[in-house]
Regions:
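Anaerobic metallocofactor- and corrinoid-dependent redox/one-carbon enzyme cores
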Residues: 1-174, 182, 189-454
């Protein structure tokens, strides 16, 4: 395996594939923090040239974390479809890129072949794509999943209604929930991040969600994003629950820092299929985000895009209903500004869809990042073109509990209006029955949450 190239009379030599992958990555402050990034733009180009000639077999044989040491690697490798892999193992990363972008290659073709790709292959081809490549390629791929309703259908754009509250006050949560529903948010999930991470608090909020859902016959899913073990305990104690949530990482060490293992998720899935309130079969919800592994020193000298791709490979094993990157949540230490956040959002969405998971995006930023609401709206617009399954919906885009900025109720509504997309069909019909939508457009009643009081 020759890992060197000469550009303009200068020879660049790379130590191993891991270094090639890291230095081929677009500029990210997280990679600089980890001392993995290319030192110059010229070195980045050289790494991309070398990576383009690497074969998929070489990438499979050199996972970011050794098979013997890491259950994430083992799940990714063991789940691989061998006939598909054998067909393409001699391809270079450049060959894979050209095949994906070829106008004759369909979304169905990509979905079929993706079962033969490891996460390192997915990350590698992502690094050779420009932003428009990522949009064009992702838009080809359609990934659906079913919980109570089906997300990801052609012509739909969904929204997670996130009615977070600083004290978990049920009435405050309800006010945000009703307002969001009246704007057409919530078809992906009614999902709250609780202040108090306990089974008792999760159960209390889940019961309020279920009460509202049943009273108005709302076709959607409910979830409280406490720790997976707290949610499991709540379900075991009889709380209604459609989805169990967990933040995930791209290494076993990262997941252990989050307080769980693959076995925990297997148990959570089995519990939901036995005692959950959803139809299924997709009953899990995962969130990711570039750089989380570095925070727990669980990145194994691997760049943040490659580790993020491994999150999606890990997620695929559990057939989740929802997966989304929380793209700018960690802050400027890992994604410095709007340009880096935009790039990361497009990368994550493409890698998730290429891996085969139902992919959304929390287009967001922290208040100490060089980004603003316009930048996040730009990213949401680009991801809508890329066929993103869902965004977040928070009152005015300002999460007063988590202290970060994201998309509000109006953004998804506006993007649906611009593109002619709708909510999930059953939810769209509910909006029409309630008078919030007429002939595909929001009515004057939209935004009036008081109309849902009872």
């Amino acid at each position: 395996m020759k890992l060197q190239t000469t550009l303009l009379g200068k020879t660049y030599v790379f130590r191993d594939l891991k270094q090639v992958l890291a230095k081929a990555n677009e500029e990210k402050t997280g990679d600089k923090l980890a001392r993995l990034a290319a030192e110059t733009a010229q070195e980045r180009v050289a790494a991309k040239v070398v990576l383009a000639g690497v074969t998929l077999e070489e990438l499979r044989e050199n996972p970011a974390v050794p098979y013997e040491e890491d259950e994430v690697t083992r799940l990714i490798q063991d789940d691989l479809n061998e006939p598909q892999y054998q067909r393409i193992k001699g391809w270079t990363v450049s060959d894979l890129r050209e095949w994906i972008l070829d106008e004759g290659t369909t979304g169905a073709d990509i979905r079929r072949l993706s079962r033969g790709l490891t996460s390192e292959m997915v990350a590698a081809v992502c690094k050779l794509m420009g932003n428009l490549d990522l949009i064009y390629a992702a838009n080809k791929i359609r990934v659906t999943a079913h919980c109570n309703t089906t997300i990801g259908l052609p012509g739909t754009l969904s929204c997670r209604l996130q009615p977070n509250h600083t004290t978990d006050d049920p009435e405050g949560i309800t006010a945000s929930l009703l307002e969001g529903l009246s704007f057409g948010a919530g078809d992906a999930v009614l999902g709250l991040n609780p202040v108090t991470d306990s089974a008792e608090q999760a159960a209390k909020i889940l019961r309020r969600f279920q009460e509202i859902k049943e009273h108005w016959h709302i076709p959607t899913q409910i979830c409280v994003l406490a720790h997976v073990t707290a949610q499991m305990k709540a379900v075991e104690q009889g709380a209604p629950c459609d989805l169990i949530f967990q933040s995930i990482a791209g290494s076993q060490k990262g997941n252990e820092a989050f307080g769980f293992t693959a076995k925990t998720l297997e148990e959570a899935k089995a519990l939901m299929l036995q005692r959950g309130t959803a139809e299924g079969p997709n009953v899990l919800y995962f969130e990711t985000g570039q750089g989380s592994e570095l925070s727990s020193n669980a990145h194994f000298d691997t760049d943040q895009v490659t580790m993020e791709a491994r999150c999606y490979g890990f997620a695929r094993h559990f057939a989740p209903f929802l997966v989304n990157t929380v793209v700018g949540f960690i802050g400027p230490e890992y994604l410095y500004d709007a340009r880096q956040v935009t790039r990361a959002g497009l990368e994550d969405h493409f890698m998730g869809k290429l891996t085969g998971v139902s992919m959304g995006c929390d287009c967001c930023y922290t208040n100490h990042m060089k980004a603003d609401q316009n930048d996040i709206e730009n990213l949401a617009g680009l991801l809508t073109l890329a066929g993103c399954n869902y965004f977040m919906g928070i009152p005015h885009g300002d999460d007063i509990m988590l202290n970060y900025q994201t998309t509000g109720f109006r953004e998804t509504a506006a993007l649906r209006e611009i593109t002619g997309k709708t909510a999930i069909p059953e939810f769209q019909r509910w909006l029409e029955q309630m008078g919030f939508v007429e002939n595909g457009h929001l009515t004057k009643k939209a935004g009036d949450g008081s109309s849902l009081l009872y």
